Every structure is written in C-alpha cells, then in structure tokens.
C-alpha cells in the first residue's frame, strides 16, 4: 500500500484520504443545501420590514424567540427555587440542572412537540424536561400557562420600555442642544400655516422637545406601576398552590414575593383572573402611540421647513432623492418617521379592543393579536427614535440655512412691524384710526405688488413716503430689526433647558447610542 506524508509528518493512506474527502464533500454539500434553503426562505416568504429595514437589533432581540423562551425557563427556575426554599419536594440538584440548561433549547424538538400536543407551553415543558431529566417531574409545578406567558410578556415590555426610554432621553438631549444653539435666530412663526409673527429656530425646537418630555413622564409612570402577574393559577384563585402548601397562605404570598424579586420586580398584581389585566398592554402601547404623535409632529414640521429651504434633514453624499429628478433632496427620514408613527398610533386600537373582550377570567382571543400588536408598537417606536437620533445628531443632523431664514423673515417683517410703526406715530401726535386705515391700504398695495407682479415688498417705502407717519429712515431701520419681534424666546429656551431638560438628563444620563438606520 502506498504511503504519503503530510506536512506534519503523519502517515496518510490514499484510501483514508479518499474517504475523508468524500465526507468533507458531503458535509459541504449539506451546508450548501442548507444555505440555499435559508436564502430561499428569506426571498420567497414574508418577513416583517420592522426586522429587515427599520428596528434595531437590540429591540428585535427583546421580542425574539430566544428572549421569550429563555425567560420562560428563568421563570421555571425561579418557581422551582422558591418552592424548594418553602419546603416542597424540590431539590437543589434539580434547581441547578434547570438553571444550567436555561439556554439549551432544542427548538426543533419544541416545534415537533407542539404539533403533537397543540400547546406551546406544554411543548416547551416537555422539551425542557428532556435536557433536565432529574428535574423533569417538578417543572411547572402548580403553575398554569400564563405563569410563564404573561410574566414573560411583562418582563419583555419592561425591557423594551427601558430601551425606548434610553433613546428618548438622548433625543431630548440632542433637541435641547439644538434649541440652545439657535435660540437667538429669528424665523417666521405660523398659525394656519400662514406667517403670523416671529419666533426663533431654537424656541420652536423646545416645542418638539417638550412634547417628548411629556411622553417620557408617561413612560416613567407606566414603568413604575408595572407588576408581574405572579403565580395566580388557572383562574387567579391560587387554588393549586393552596393544595401544594396545604392551605398555608403566608407561604403562597412568600412564593410570589420570591419570584418577583428574582425577576427584578418589587411586586405582583394584587388580583387577577388567569391573566394580568390587558389594560396594562393598552396603557403601555398608549405611551408608544404618544411618542409616535410627538415624533410625527416633529417630522411634519421638518418636512415643511425643508420645503421652505430653511432647515434640512441630513442628506448623504451618495444619496439619491429621486429616480427621475436627480436634483431632488427629499426628506425621506422624516417622511419615514411620519409613516411609522401613523402605524403605531393606529396599532394602539388593538390592545384597547383586546382589553375590552377579555371575557370573565380569560379568553384566548387576546393571544394572536397580542403577539403582533404589542411587539410592533415597540419595534415601530424603536425605528422612529433611531431616525430621530440620526436627524437630531449634533454633528451630522439638521442643517440650518440662516440666510434663507433671514431673507424670508425680511420679506414678511414689514407687515408684522406695522403695529410698532403705528404706535410710534401715535406717540408723536398722529391719529390712531387714520394711521390704521392707511396701513391697511398700503398693506394691500404691497401685497398685490408681491403676489401679482412678483416684486419685493415695498410697504416700508410707502410708509416712509407718507408724512403722517412722521418716521425717518433711521427710525424705520431701528424698528425693522428681527430681534425686536422675538419676545422672550431666548430666555424661554434657557429657562426650559434649565428647569425641564437638565433635571431629566441629570437623573438619567445620556447614552452613547448611535442611530441604527439600514436604508
């Protein structure tokens, strides 16, 4: 038999080499086929755009199968540990085995089991028991499906709210910095989308920021009142635990306290049916909808300002605005904010109807809807905040065109200044009613000149030429300074940041989150 030597000096025989090569080729072929299946699954079946385009990996994980089912197992561990400490026939060895296998989930086995038993919780009980043979007999002892299902949902919502809070605080901080930077830059203020008076770019930003602060306050409130379901049994009576603990009420209450503490909660709900009240889902999703409202207001304002060429969202060097019109710079980020916000605002109707249709101690018509609506409320808001983090970034975010802003201010300022001009003339002895009528007539003339002839606003020239106003060019120039018409804008911004924003930032800190935008 021929014998060769490889670079390590070991003898390799042709027959063995051949068999090894065949095995490697077969394995590679299997991997290739599996990859083809994965690719096919990603292109010939529906995938949520929240996962493929919009939401962060962090938020996607929170609503993933791994997060859900490992939390189920952690709850089973907490239940077993508490039952052991309270004297039930559960051993430390069994608890240790359960704890060691929290992440050892055979999803194929669980799926096969669910096809047989048509019950997701029991499928996972059996799957967990297979890898924990010593603890198999005590898994889920005294519990009902909602012990793992509902408690996990509460834990997931808590974790998701904390992610939302962290990003929301950073957006608030970035908007406050923007407001401070531009607190003294006069711009047109609008009512009915018509120029009204002046405000400043920074003062307007405080309006966006303040609404987000209101949302943060609501979010903190919902976080503070969030409680675990606990271990209430099939209809909320804890009858199974009364049997297990032979009527010892104190032990049953201690069981819940221990479980809540292990899962990071201060308390469980005082009373329930089989489930926690679905009003909790509605209250939480209502906060998500409120954040979406605030974001939509911000996004719409930026879209309008971009159409005026006053402020633009960031536009990348290689970004294409239109497939036909190469010159376009569309506000696609803010348009996406508004689009996603609309979805989240409508989504809140789902938990509202779900809460209203929970018959007696529970029905199952909440389940399918809840799996979709609660997750998508968070995924949607996460996507919105990611975009807002990008758009409000202090280095590469909103672009302010101060010269355009000033030019548009000066085009309208003559109309806005007429009251001050009239007051000065009255102080010099003029007739208020006659001057008011003259200003009305001159304003109509100047307006027609602008709209019908496309010429500049000449209202100031018309007033200067009328001796009844008794005003000089120097006096007119002094009146026509935009800063004279912004009231307390700068002070309001300073006070808002000092009294409203700074306490929030000091209490929460600012994360180092970087906007995660895929497209």
Protein language model regions, located:
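Short, positively charged and aromatic/hydrophobic N-terminal segments
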Residues: 15-32, 37
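A helix-coil-helix interface module used to build multimeric assemblies
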Residues: 35-239, 245-260, 321-322, 332-336, ...
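Short beta-alpha connecting loops at secondary-structure transitions
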Residues: 60-64, 109-111, 319-339, 361-376, ...
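Short amphipathic alpha-helical segments with heptad-repeat character
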Residues: 66, 158-169, 176, 202, ...
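Glycine-rich anion/phosphate-binding loop at the beta-strand->alpha-helix junction
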Residues: 215, 274-367, 371-372
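A short, charged helix-loop
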Residues: 258-273
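Long, amphipathic alpha-helical stalk/connector segments used for oligomerization, subunit docking
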Residues: 343-430, 438
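C-terminal hydrophobic structural anchor segments
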Residues: 419-470
């Amino acid at each position: 038999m021929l014998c060769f030597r490889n670079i390590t000096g070991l003898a390799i025989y042709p027959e063995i080499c051949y068999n090894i090569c065949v095995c490697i080729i077969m394995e590679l072929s299997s991997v290739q086929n599996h990859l083809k299946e994965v690719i096919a699954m990603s292109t010939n079946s529906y995938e949520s755009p929240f996962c493929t385009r919009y939401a962060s990996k962090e938020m996607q994980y929170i609503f993933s199968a791994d997060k859900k089912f490992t939390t189920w197992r952690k709850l089973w561990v907490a239940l077993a540990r508490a039952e052991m400490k309270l004297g039930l026939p559960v051993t430390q060895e069994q608890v240790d085995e359960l704890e060691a296998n929290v992440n050892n989930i055979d999803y194929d086995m669980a799926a096969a089991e669910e096809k047989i038993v048509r019950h997701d919780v029991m499928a996972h009980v059996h799957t967990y028991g297979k890898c924990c043979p010593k603890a198999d007999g005590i898994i889920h002892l005294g519990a009902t499906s909602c012990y793992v299902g509902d408690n996990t949902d509460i834990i997931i919502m808590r974790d998701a709210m904390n992610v939302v809070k962290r990003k929301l605080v950073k957006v608030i901080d970035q908007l406050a910095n923007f407001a401070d930077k531009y607190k003294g830059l006069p711009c047109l203020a609008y009512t009915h989308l018509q120029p009204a008076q002046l405000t400043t770019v920074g003062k307007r930003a405080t309006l966006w920021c303040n609404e987000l602060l209101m949302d943060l306050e609501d979010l903190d409130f919902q976080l503070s009142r969030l409680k675990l379901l606990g271990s209430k049994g099939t209809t909320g009576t804890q009858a199974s635990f009364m049997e297990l603990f032979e009527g010892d009420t104190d032990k049953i209450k201690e069981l819940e306290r221990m479980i809540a503490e292990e899962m990071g909660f201060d308390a469980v709900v005082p009373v329930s049916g089989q489930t926690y009240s679905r009003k909790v889902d509605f209250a939480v999703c209502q906060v998500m909808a409120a954040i979406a409202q605030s974001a939509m207001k911000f996004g719409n304002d930026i879209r309008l300002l971009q159409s005026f060429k006053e402020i633009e969202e960031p536009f990348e060097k290689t970004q294409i605005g239109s497939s036909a019109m190469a010159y376009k710079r569309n506000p696609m980020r803010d348009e996406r904010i508004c689009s996603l916000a609309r979805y989240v605002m409508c989504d809140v109707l789902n938990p509202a109807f779900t809460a209203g249709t929970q018959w007696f101690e529970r029905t199952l018509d909440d389940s399918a809807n809840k799996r979709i609506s609660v997750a998508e409320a968070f995924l949607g808001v996460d996507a919105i905040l990611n975009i807002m983090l990008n758009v409000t970034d202090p280095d590469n975010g909103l672009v302010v065109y101060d010269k355009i802003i000033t030019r548009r201010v000066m085009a309208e300022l003559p109309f806005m200044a007429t009251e001050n001009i009239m007051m000065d003339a009255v102080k010099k002895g003029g007739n208020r009613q006659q001057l008011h009528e003259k200003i009305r007539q001159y304003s109509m003339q100047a307006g027609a000149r602008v709209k019908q002839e496309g010429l500049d606003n000449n209202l100031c020239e018309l007033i200067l030429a009328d001796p009844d106003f008794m005003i000089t060019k120097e006096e007119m120039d002094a009146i026509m300074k935009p800063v004279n018409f912004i009231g307390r804008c700068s002070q309001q911004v300073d006070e808002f940041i000092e009294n409203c924003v700074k306490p929030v930032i000091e209490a929460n800190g600012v994360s180092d989150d970087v906007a995660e935008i895929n497209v």
